């Protein structure tokens, strides 16, 4: 089957990019590809059998027209000016059979005009982390970019140490970022900001294109998508680590996996990025940061959208966030209805977990085994303060009895939203260390496991992290 690529970005937004081709690596070789995603995109298996090829930037497929995008942004709350694709190249937009499109973005593709002081490269460590994280999030049901392939090489890349140069093929319906809009707003070119908005609406919100107040309706939906995404992050214990405005997806996707981390111990102020000295992007601050980022996006739209309309959309953020978060947390607790004591029960559980440094994922998974008429709980042994747990658990069982549902039905629901497996940093690190020794077994094994996060397992993927794996420091260097 011949793949079809179109050039909407190149044709419709000529001042937002520089056209250029990838720079191949030395002795590049394909070490992993996403068979399930490739099948979804109707990619012929033969493309994965001919060396690095397009996956390593060595050649292009018919219809591809590679380019690097320019954007700007706020980093750690400070205006950083022009940024852009410093090591990534958009190879093309694949047109799918249903009329939708999928960007093919090659990360680590070499120097671009936006590389600043960088070398345009990515390392094997970071490409493995992003591939694992994006696929883990996808199978958890959270909107995200996807990983299609990883290529490693003999090219040395200099970070804290010398590492292997690598490339990741990332795919997404769009790579539109808040930072694209900021770039032209701060250059005092509001007509180009409007062109970006029109492009987004035309191709991704086409049902709004003929509406008189399309910009208000569109921005309101961007706010809602962002609020929903952040709510989902919080419910699974995901910390992004670098929520700069240039890393915010207009479509509400999880974008740019760097020093991310999933909670091990329940620590509301968890900071996964060791460069985040002030804790701006801590786990519990993510909802507030996302709203701040939306306010920056709203500012770029103010030359052609009424400020009252923008503020009205921003005001909806908190309620959308709380609605999505509340619905998912009630499911995690096994509540079929909404009762006034639900928030108090959840907050008391969180307080107990924080005091005891309880494992976030294991606590909710074990809670899924609760039988409402039994005072015994397998979760009890996870707590040192048994009296405090017993007091909470008695009230929790009483709350469960208010819903007309069998234990088996409730347990099935809870186990469908409380994963047994999340991508803990130590699991990723183990796969990375093996891959750096040319052993890809663990990389493939872990990818396969992450496809079924809600299934029970009896291996160390679902055990408590070892002591060395709990506080792994992760940086932005990639």
Curated annotation (Swiss-Prot):
Keywords, sorted A to Z: ATP-binding, Magnesium, Manganese, Metal-binding, Nucleotide-binding, Nucleotidyltransferase, Transferase
EC number(s) given by UniProt: 2.7.7.-, 2.7.7.108
Transferase listed as a keyword: yes
Coiled coil, from the record: none
Required co-factors: Mg(2+); Mn(2+)
Enzyme class: transferase
Molecular-function GO term, any one: AMPylase activity
Keyword Magnesium: yes
Family: Belongs to the SELO family.
Protein name: Protein nucleotidyltransferase YdiU
Species the sequence originates in: Escherichia coli O1:K1 / APEC
């Amino acid at each position: 089957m011949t793949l079809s690529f179109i050039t909407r970005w190149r044709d419709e937004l000529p001042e937002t990019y520089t056209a250029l081709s990838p720079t191949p690596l030395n002795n590049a070789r394909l070490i992993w590809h996403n068979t399930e995603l490739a099948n979804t995109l109707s990619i012929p298996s033969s493309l994965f059998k001919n060396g690095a090829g397009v996956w390593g930037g060595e050649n292009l497929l018919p219809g591809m027209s590679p380019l690097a995008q320019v954007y700007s942004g706020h980093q750690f709350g400070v205006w950083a000016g022009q940024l852009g694709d410093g090591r990534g190249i958009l190879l093309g937009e694949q047109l799918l059979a249903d009329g939708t499109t999928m960007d093919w973005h090659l990360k680590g593709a070499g120097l671009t005009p936006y590389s600043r002081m960088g070398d345009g490269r990515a390392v094997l460590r970071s490409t493995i982390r992003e591939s694992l994280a994006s696929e883990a999030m996808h199978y958890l049901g959270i909107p995200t970019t996807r990983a299609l392939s990883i290529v490693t090489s003999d090219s040395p890349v200099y970070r804290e140490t010398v590492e292997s140069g690598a490339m990741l093929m990332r795919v997404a319906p769009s790579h539109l970022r808040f930072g694209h809009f900021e770039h032209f707003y701060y250059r005092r070119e509001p007509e180009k900001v409007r062109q970006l908005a029109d492009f987004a609406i035309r191709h991704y919100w086409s049902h709004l294109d003929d509406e008189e107040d399309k910009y208000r309706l569109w921005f309101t939906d961007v706010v809602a998508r962002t609020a929903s995404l952040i709510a989902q992050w919080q419910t699974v214990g995901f910390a992004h680590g670098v929520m700069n405005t240039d890393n915010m997806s207009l479509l509400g996707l999880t974008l740019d996996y760097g020093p991310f981390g999933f909670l091990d111990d329940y620590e509301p102020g968890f900071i996964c990025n060791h460069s985040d000295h002030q804790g701006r992007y801590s786990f519990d601050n993510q909802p507030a940061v996302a709203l701040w980022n939306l306010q920056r996006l709203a500012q770029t739209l103010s030359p052609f959208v009424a400020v009252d309309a923008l503020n009205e959309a921003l005001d909806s953020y908190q309620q959308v966030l709380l609605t999505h978060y509340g619905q998912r947390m009630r499911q995690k607790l096994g509540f079929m209805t909404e009762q006034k004591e639900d928030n108090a029960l959840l907050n008391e559980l969180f307080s107990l977990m924080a005091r005891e440094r309880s494992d976030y994922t294991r606590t909710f998974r074990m809670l899924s085994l609760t039988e409402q008429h039994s005072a015994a709980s397998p979760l009890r042994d996870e707590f040192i303060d048994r009296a405090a747990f017993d007091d909470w658990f008695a009230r929790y069982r009483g709350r469960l009895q208010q819903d007309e549902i069998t234990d088996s039905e409730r347990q099935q629901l809870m186990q469908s939203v409380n994963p047994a497996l999340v991508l803990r940093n130590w699991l990723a690190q183990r796969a990375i260390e093996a891959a750096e020794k040319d052993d890809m077994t663990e990389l493939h094994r872990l990818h396969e496991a992450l496809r079924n996060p809600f299934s029970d397992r009896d291996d160390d993927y679902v055990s408590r992290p070892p002591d060395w794996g709990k506080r792994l420091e992760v940086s932005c260097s990639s």
